[in-house]
Every structure is written in C-alpha cells, then in structure tokens.
C-alpha cells in the first residue's frame, strides 16, 4: 500500500513577518500547519528576539532555499549603549556596565568603519553547529568552543538615530553577518559596551517588504475561509510568491519541449545562446514554466542540478 502523504503538495514562498519571542523553527511549523503543506523550510534563522522577513519555502520551493540563504539581507537594529550582555542582546544577562561618553562624531566614525569586507567571529549564542550541536547549546552549558572567522561584507551601514544611550542603525549585508556581533564590537570600539534591544529584518534578496504577512493575518484568513465556507487554500495560496523568485537573479535558459523532457530525465543538453559558465535557471516554452536550476558543464552543456517535480493538481506558484 502506498504511504499516505501528510499535507498537500503546495509550492511557493510565503514572506512571513516573524513575531518576536518565538524561534524561526516554531514560526515555520505554524506556517506549515496553516497551509497544511507537505514540505516546508525557512531560509535563514532569525533570533527569537528578532522580527521581520522570514521567507518560508513550501513544497518544491524547498529545493531552492539555499539561494535565499546565500542572498543579501537588510536589517534595522536598535542598540543600548553602556551595557554588555553575554548574548549581545537583551535576552542575555548583563555582564558589564560602563558610562556612556560618546559624541555623534565618534559614533558615526565607528559605524562607518564596519563598511566593506571583513572577518567576523560568530557569537557563541548562534545556531552555527560544532560537532553536530548548535553553538548556543554549548554556550548555555558554559562551554566555549573554537569558532573560525568568516568573511562577511557590509554593503552599507547608516546611523538613523542617536538619543541618549540608544542607537538605531540600518544595515545591508552579506549572508552570515551577525548584527549582534557588529553591535557588540561597536560598543567595545566606543569604550562603553552595547547590546541589541530590537532587531528587524527588512529585506532578503529582492523580496518586497510590503508582501510580508503575519501569523495573525494567516490565522484570520483561516477564520474568514471558515466563515465563508470555502477551502482555506482559495485565500491562502494567492499570498505565495512563485518559487522561481528564489533564483530570479540567475541567468535564464529557455528550453523547448524536447530539451525540457531531456533535462527532466537528468540529461545535460546543448542550448544555443546559453551562458558559458555558472549556474542558470531553466524555463520551458513560451509560458516560461520554471523547470529548475542547472550548472554549465565544462563542455558547455546545461547540466540539470535541481529539478521541479510537479504532481497532479499541484499548484505551480
């Protein structure tokens, strides 16, 4: 007997506005239940303290989540000067208190120094893994383990507000950048210590800020569907972004029906006008149905890497 699937095979990306106080995985599970999705995965964890854009991939879109993990991010952060915590945010314990004697000029100069490429050592209170366990589990046990520095790029960092001991900044950065670490480093540069009190992710890749939805809104839609006696998917599914938005920055290679059939069977194909190297997104026919992503092989052929598999009555969002 065929194994019964749990959930429906819905495809697409929902831009969740994660609330504060819950983990990214908790938020993911709530969205998965609301959509009754067979598969779901998020694209880069936010701390429980943090709010904002958490793209959640449903169904076949999970195959392309790595591209969003690797994409640029944007944040607005509020930091409190004068106090350093063991987690570099307000969820932790204050470990040091110092006077704040900082001028606007000093602050702007220190903030500007973070712009560009640099090496950053991840916080012990992060989800990075060491020997299979997240770093924060070691940290909570009072154990410090070695962490390698990682190359990050801060494309822009701007001071939005400086009032008393509170600093508000906007940051555009590469993947793997820890805003808590930047804040802690800033506090040390200023000689007074600092920690994050508010962190909001305002952008991932090129996804529009105004397409985010909250858990409250999703639950209200469920109630609305029940009141109207219609299937929830009729109201929920239009909120999904197409799954190829995760790879929209990749060069497009359009395939005819014959080539589409070959790549869907895992065969590399020769495509006139295709790039000579790198990763591409494949579309099919005049309607440009998203097929998947491919790598350009050494011989110039388009070699399928990750393919979309559609099943009967499966939405193609």
Swiss-Prot record:
Its EC number is 5.4.99.25. The active site is at 47 (nucleophile). GO terms for biological process: mRNA pseudouridine synthesis; tRNA pseudouridine synthesis. It catalyses: uridine(55) in tRNA = pseudouridine(55) in tRNA. The keyword DNA repair does not apply. GO terms for molecular function: RNA binding; tRNA pseudouridine(55) synthase activity. Responsible for synthesis of pseudouridine from uracil-55 in the psi GC loop of transfer RNAs. Belongs to the pseudouridine synthase TruB family. Type 1 subfamily. This is tRNA pseudouridine synthase B. It comes from Vibrio atlanticus (strain LGP32).
């Amino acid at each position: 007997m065929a194994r019964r699937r749990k959930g429906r095979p819905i495809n697409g990306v929902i831009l969740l506005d994660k609330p504060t106080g819950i983990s990214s995985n908790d938020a993911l599970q709530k969205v998965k239940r609301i959509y009754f999705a067979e598969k779901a995965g998020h694209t880069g964890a936010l701390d429980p303290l943090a709010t904002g854009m958490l793209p959640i991939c449903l169904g076949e879109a999970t195959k392309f989540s790595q591209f969003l993990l690797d994409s640029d991010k944007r944040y607005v952060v509020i930091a409190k000067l004068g106090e350093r915590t063991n987690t570099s945010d307000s969820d932790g314990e204050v470990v040091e208190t110092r006077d704040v004697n900082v001028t606007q000029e000093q602050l702007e100069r220190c903030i500007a120094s973070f712009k560009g490429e640099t090496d950053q050592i991840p916080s012990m209170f992060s989800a990075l893994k060491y020997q299979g366990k997240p770093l924060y589990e070691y940290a909570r046990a009072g154990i410090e383990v070695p962490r390698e520095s990682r190359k990050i790029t801060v494309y822009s960092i701007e001071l939005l507000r400086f009032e008393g001991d509170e600093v508000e900044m906007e940051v555009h950065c590469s993947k793997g950048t820890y805003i808590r670490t930047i804040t802690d480093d800033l506090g040390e540069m200023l000689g007074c210590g600092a920690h994050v009190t508010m962190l909001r992710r305002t952008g991932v890749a090129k996804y529009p800020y105004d397409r985010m939805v909250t858990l409250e809104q999703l639950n209200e839609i469920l109630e609305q569907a029940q009141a109207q006696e219609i299937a929830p998917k009729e109201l929920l599914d239009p909120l999904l972004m197409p799954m190829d938005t995760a790879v929209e920055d990749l060069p497009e290679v359009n395939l005819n029906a014959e080539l589409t059939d070959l790549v869907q069977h895992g065969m590399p194909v020769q495509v006139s006008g295709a790039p000579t190297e790198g990763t591409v997104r494949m579309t099919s026919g005049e309607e440009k149905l998203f097929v998947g992503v491919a790598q350009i092989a050494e011989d110039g052929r388009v070699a399928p890497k990750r393919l979309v598999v559609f099943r009967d009555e499966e939405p193609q969002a």
